[in-house]
Amino acid sequence: MTTQVVKVIGAGLAGSEAAYQIAKRGIQVHLYEMRPVKQTPAHHTDKFAELVCSNSLRANTLTNAVGVIKEEMRRMDSVIIRAADECSVPAGGALAVDRHEFAAKVTEYVKNHPNVTVMNEEITEIPEGPTVIATGPLTSPALAAQLKELTGEEYFYFYDAAAPIIEKDSIDMNKVYLKSRYDKGEAAYLNCPMTEDEFNRFYDALIAAETVPLKEFEKEIFFEGCMPVEVMAARGRQTLLFGPMKPVGLEDPKTGKTPYAVVQLRQDDAAGTLYNIVGFQTHLKWGPQKEVLQLIPGLENAEIVRYGVMHRNTFINSPKLLRPTYQYKHRDDLFFAGQMTGVEGYVESAASGLLAGINAARLLKGEEPVVLPSVTAMGSMANYITSTNAKNFQPMNANFGLFAPLEKKIKKKQERNEAYATRALETIQNFVNI
């Protein structure tokens, strides 16, 4: 048993997971979280693992790479996935959570661990000794400056945008219908169908609506998975019809026909009183935002309880700076985790924290840090962000394209994905007790 302490900076998804993994291995953790002493532009509470974008952790099935990464994490006792499973709300084939219950549960599990000491203060310098930096996309300016000095690399800037949340009672239920795309899983989404004329009116208003201005020195680089709806719309009138307003598989039961466009609403809390507008992340000003959203059939009188907002996201050039153990190449006892590493998504961020935490604990115990094979979802993510072309490095979600190729080619997509999943879960069993 070592008497050394690991400092974990940031109690988001990655930091909470890292702290838990280190603590459960018998090592003391000092977990630093600047909230509520200092807030970020996107957070609203002092809870750990607060979800600031969607409340969905995405697909839960093993034919999807993010479903595989979740199952790997379950088997490795992820505190984030355990809390998510316990706080889930209906979402078809996806794992969505009541965001308030989820954050409270993660906070409880991590804070109450006897090996975790929570420090509510801002860290402005990179500490000496074993450290995991998991400060996320909204790293404070002081620490960001230190990290820039440490790495010698310029940061990249892009923006994630959060979708509006509305009260269910303000939805005109006579104009919407309950259905999941292609009837997969339970009917979990409220669907707002649009005619071509309704879509065109909506589109024209969206394109003309005023957005919150960005600072001149910041480049607009959006990650495709969380792109503001107005930026997507600016690419062309048809773009939304192949994105968040895609109507295929969502036939209107009243007409038996597929609408011209569909806006989907997903349950956001366990009580089913709040719904978020799927894929409608935005940084429109609040007045125009309400006017545009009320052009959606069924939302004419929508009460918006949280407007869509936009915030900066920051990540390092991991191919140049990190090993697949999440260690900094030039300092063995310094680890990075979460979106700062260029993994994109809630689950991927937590997964990086899980592996960084395990390896920080192993380092203190005098054991070799683990590199997970790229036949696993977690290993494929770590491999990608540390070995891809550094020149054009961009954030990446979990996907089967990152996995090591199968020994035998399989033509059918579902069978191929099942083979990836089977191989990954068989392999991860060798690491569940590390």
Curated annotation (Swiss-Prot):
GO biological process, one term: tRNA wobble uridine modification
UniProt GO MF annotations: flavin adenine dinucleotide binding; tRNA (uracil(54)-C5)-methyltransferase activity, 5,10-methylenetetrahydrofolate-dependent
EC numbers for this chain: 2.1.1.74
Sorted UniProt keywords: Cytoplasm, FAD, Flavoprotein, Methyltransferase, NAD, NADP, Transferase, tRNA processing
Function description: Catalyzes the folate-dependent formation of 5-methyl-uridine at position 54 (M-5-U54) in all tRNAs.
PANTHER family (UniProt xref): GLUCOSE INHIBITED DIVISION PROTEIN A (PTHR11806), METHYLENETETRAHYDROFOLATE--TRNA-(URACIL-5-)-METHYLTRANSFERASE TRMFO (PTHR11806:SF2)
Name this polypeptide is given: Methylenetetrahydrofolate--tRNA-(uracil-5-)-methyltransferase TrmFO
Organism: Bacillus cytotoxicus (strain DSM 22905 / CIP 110041 / 391-98 / NVH 391-98)
GN (gene name): trmFO
